[in-house]
Amino acid sequence: MGAARRFVDAQLRDWGLDDLVDDAALIVSELVTNSIRTGCQTRMLVGVRRPTDRMVRILVGDGSRSMPVMVQARPDATSGRGLAMVHRLTHGRWGVTPLPFGKVVHADLAMPR
């Protein structure tokens, strides 16, 4: 997970998008954690794209066909809040693309105005 966070951090700083680094680090951490929890621990793809000047897209792909599901975590739960945080940080702009070999989860993070 540390390598994924460092990769995203370096790319955003290279693009001069330092204001997005903290939120992006949290997003990539949650997506990678979900990928690991669904059993994909050996092969994972992490990417960052910039589809527009005002948005970055964080991608995490893996070989699991298990789709992520956002759940309502109980107040005393120690897990289950990751996708809800991703949903909040992206204002609902995240999704999953199923592929023959697994899936890619993307999360779109907008530049602050």
Label each region the model flagged.
Residues M1-G2, L12-L17, V60-R65, A77:
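Short low-complexity stretches enriched in small and charged residues
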Residues G2-S29:
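Conserved short strand/loop->alpha-helix "switch" segment adjacent to the catalytic nucleotide/phosphoryl-transfer site
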Residues D23-Q41:
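Histidine-centered phosphotransfer motif of kinases
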Residues I36-R113:
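Conserved beta-strand-loop-beta-strand hairpin that lines the nucleotide-binding pocket
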